[in-house]
Each structure stands twice: as structure tokens, then as C-alpha cells.
Amino acid sequence: AGGNEKLKSRPVVVGCGPAGLFCAYFLAEYGYQPVLLEQGAPVEERQKDVEEFWKTGVLKPDSNVQFGEGGAGTFSDGKLNTLIKDPVGRNRKVLEIFVENGAPKDILYVNKPHIGTDILRTVIRNMREKILVWGGEIHFHTQMTEVLFTENTRRIRGIVYEDLLKKEKEEIQTETLVLAPGHSARETFAMLFEKKVPMEAKSSVSYTHLTLPTIA
């Protein structure tokens, strides 16, 4: 409720592209110990699978140039761009976090910031390690299959996820869920539609400055 109520359970973030990764990063930094679920592979595994694809043409659906930790831009040339107008300095904060995790300092002041593919993968790995050090939890090859609601108030009470390697399902209790599934999320949107979760297309983005309290 606007940051005024103490969380009863750990927040869950679905998707480890830029939105999900940074969301989990901030939550972990402020002591909320998020659980981050990613359907694809960690960046090291992605790199091996991508190299194998270029050599053999064998494509792994959940681990490739477009899919996995870091999102679709991980194997781009590392150019940084945003079309979001940001009066409160969040774009600058993103660049600072990149630098803190291994990106070159010149991205803070050059007109067209550029990290480079190899460095970008290192940055993503370093961000992941910090999330873990700060008490977060990350599950790769894991797909959210259901959102659970309370019967009367229709408030989120948890999710069900499947370990895609073990083919096992588990339930997590949470009242805070952030969905950042990126592309190839048809099953997620279909499930939300069946659950009668209100959805709308993005129109414009406006920011309100929020200050998160540090958990003792």
C-alpha cells in the first residue's frame, strides 16, 4: 500500500530482462530479498548455447540470442538507448549501476553510450551476484504457470512455478508480484486473461518519485 505496510512475504519478480533484473536489484539492495524467476538460462549458459547455434544451427528455445538472463539485448552490440522521458533521474541511476558493475565510466557522459557485448555480459553477471549477496534468490529454467488470488478480495496470495528441468511444480506465497516477462509471454498473458486480471496496452509513462525504506 504505497510502501506504508510491512511486507508479510518476499516479493516475486518474473522475468530477468532489463526491467525484471533492475527491479530485483533495487528490491535486494533495500533489503526485501526478492525471488527472481527466469524461464531461460543464465548468461554463461546462454553464451555457450549461442556459440553452439552459430556453429551447428541447433537452436535451444529457452537459451539463445533472444531468450534468457539479461533479455534480448544481452547479445547486441551494447548500445544504450531509452525513449522514456525521465525528469527524476532514473535513467542516470541505471547508467551508474552499470558502471558500478563493470561498465566503462564514459557511458555517464558520452552522447551515445555504448558498453559492448562482452562487458555487458559481465555487468549482468555482477548484478546477479549482488542480488544473491543481498539475500535475493534466483531460479533459472523456471516458468510461472499460475497466479493465486484470495477468494473474496481478489488479492494476490502467491504463484505456482514449474522447474522446467525437473518438471516439478512448486508454490510460493507472496502478496507482491512484479511481471516483467518480455517477449514470448503468450502463455503468461493467456493465463492472466483466464484469471480475469485487468490488462491494458501501454500508452504513456509518467514517473512519481518513490523512496523505499531500508529494512532493518
Give the ranges of each region predicted by the language model:
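Beta1/beta-strand and adjacent pyrophosphate-binding region of the FAD-binding site
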Residues: 7-16
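Short hydrophobic core segments
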Residues: 14, 172-182
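N-terminal Rossmann-fold NAD(P) dinucleotide-binding loop
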Residues: 20
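Glycine-rich FAD pyrophosphate-binding loop
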Residues: 32-50
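Conserved N-terminal/central alpha/beta ligand/cofactor-binding core
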Residues: 45, 51-137, 142-143
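A conserved short coil-to-beta-strand element within the FAD-binding core of flavoproteins
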Residues: 140-153
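Flavin (primarily FAD) binding-site architecture
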Residues: 179, 184-194
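Conserved small/polar residues in nucleotide/adenosyl-binding loops
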Residues: 208-214
